Amino acid sequence: MYINGFIFGKRMGDYYMDDYKDDHKDEYNDESSRHKKPGHDNSKNEQLNKYREKNTGPGEKLTSDAGLKISNDRWSLRAGRRGPTLFQDFHFYKKQSHFNRERIPEKVVHARGDGAYGEFELYKSMRHVTRAHFLQEPGCKTPVFVRFSNFIGSKGSKDTAIDIRGFATKFYTQEGNYDMLALSFAVFSVMDAMKFADFVHAVKPNPRTAVPQATVAHDNAWDYVANNQEIAHFIMWLMSGRGRPRSWRMMEAWPVNTFRFINEHGKSTFVRFVWKPMLGVHSLLLDEANIIGGVDPDYHRRDLHEAIMCGAYPEYELGVQLIQEEDQFKYDFDILDDTKLWPEEVIPVEIIGKMTLNRLVDNHFAEEEQVSFDPATVVPGIDFTNDPVLQGRSFAYRDTDYHRLGTGNINNIPVNQPIVETNLNQRQSDVRHRIDVDSVHYHKNSLAGNTPKETPPEKGGYAHYPEKVDGHKTRERPGESFFDFFSQPRMFWNSMTPVEKQQIVETFNFHLGYVKSKSVRQQVVDMFGNVDTHMATAIAESIGVNPPKESHVPVTKSSPALSQANTAYYPYTQKVAVLIGNGFNGKEVKNVLDYLHHCGVFIDIISENLGTVKGDDGMQIEVNTIFTSTYSVLYDSLYVVGGKTKNEAKFRSDIKSFVKEAYKHYKPIGVATTAASYFNNTNKNNLAGVVFAENNPNFKDEFVSAIAQQRFWNRK
């Protein structure tokens, strides 16, 4: 399958000095290239151009924020050479005062993240169900900004924490901004927004000690789980591979809430959205996620940056699930319950368009940290339902950003600005840049001809769906099926392969092993005995409590769409570590690297020292990194070439360490003819996923096929 927009041969290692040393060599470090790539010229990018400032370069002089040229930015003004600093040193005062105010409050949740710009292209018209302009004409392209994030940890936590991920998208449409706030799980942790603060308090670090960071491996989190059992489905997702994605480019995402589409005739259709990655859905192992968090806490950020700068643009298809108003009560789950998913086998996903991310931010603080997403930022044709979580989310996001960004003028910040004209009477507040020259700023008025005027719905004004609402004030749950906490978690378990089930048990064991309270551990085992008795019994044995007394709920259905075994597999953008020394077979290695390069595989050349390694035919290959600076867990596959180095014993030891860990993690390993000695001859035919080049004319194809498969679970 050809992934549209993928540009092969860009910064995949600069492998051969003689062939590739100058090929796109400077692109990764060239900041201006961020604005010159094909497809980057859209209305949002053009709008941002007027805010971009370059402060360095020939002829640029250092000034104050008032335009004063600075003669000395190194030493403060003192009374005598060894005297005290003088208060009249206004430059030092202003410099330090600004520094003292450079940080803004971090997000309570989703604090750690990163973002990119791109565009969404519609495949097919959705005119029959919605009047939203950007969903009308096939081929319509809409600029977007996407922010990926971790939920639990602080801004400085690790990317690979076992956690739910945020996937928030801002569409800059011709009718104003539309924000779609998605998560990497299809279900949420609470049924009602009232409980969200309690959930966050429980999973955050202990308020007395401020530990642990970015994890639910502590007593408070699991005490909450055991006593708020609506969270069971969410926890099953968290304990699965979905809680540790291989890459932001390889994870699905759902807004989890139920919305309405409204068409031009006023007809309402219930809708849920889903983003599906073109590269398939793939995960790290628990062991990998924990190790990577220590050796490269920026793993997902780095992966996003490298992919975009290489031209391997992340792509996702947008799908919708639609339910007619008259069918909302025909299912065994409530369509307004965010702890329940809509099974794809019951309510099919209709793919309607594709999003491509093709440009990184210019300034992390100005764009990624100041971006604001709000579920209540919608466009005509998209409306709310009585989803209890959505009702709370619809005001909470903007409220928290009023505090975090310190202004009511959030949409004046460039990344948040719509690409259409804005005219409103809410004009003042902190950091107001626009100079409004009107004397009238209220509605209705006669002095300004009652302008700016309202726009009727038939001409593009927003109007809420006229849903009939009646009943008494109550704090009851919306429906009886809200009380069914375990049927869908059981379906999720039934949908997993034996390997996925074992990984879920191991992840439970890892987290519950940190829980000190035996009572809490027992409560959790008893709770998840409702999901699967055998699973809970295996967990109980590991964490030292009794097995559950009750049997699991009698649900036999499954959903194949939930298993990652049924996802797409490609070699594209898989990352291969080439372990190499001097004296390698130049013809063989060049042939293999050329083929990997052609297939879009990312390559790192690893050896004892930086510089170059030389083959038996004189060919030189530039080394990207050294064994001391990298780790096997950072790669999807190994190509073991071997060779000669100055410190032969350490070189062989490093290779064996890489191979041992990659094999332990079920990863594919390609073995060059010069590296056969690293493997026991008697076991070569029994090493699943290990491909040998010796006497193998099909080595290239077999190795690339193994890279695409990614894991070999049948290893002994």
Regions found by a protein language model. Give the residues of each.
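Surface-exposed, charge/polar-rich loops and edge strands
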Residues: V601, A688-G689
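Amphipathic coiled-coil/heptad-repeat helices and related helical stalk/stem segments
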Residues: V589, D654-I655
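Hydrophobic residues within alpha-helices
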Residues: N591-V592, F658
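A charged, well-structured terminal subsegment
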Residues: G689-K716
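A short, aliphatic-rich alpha-helical micro-motif
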Residues: S632-V633
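Active-site-adjacent core segments of small-molecule enzymes
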Residues: Y2-G583, K590, H597-H598, F602, ...
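Catalytic nucleophile loop
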Residues: S517, S637-G642, I655-N681
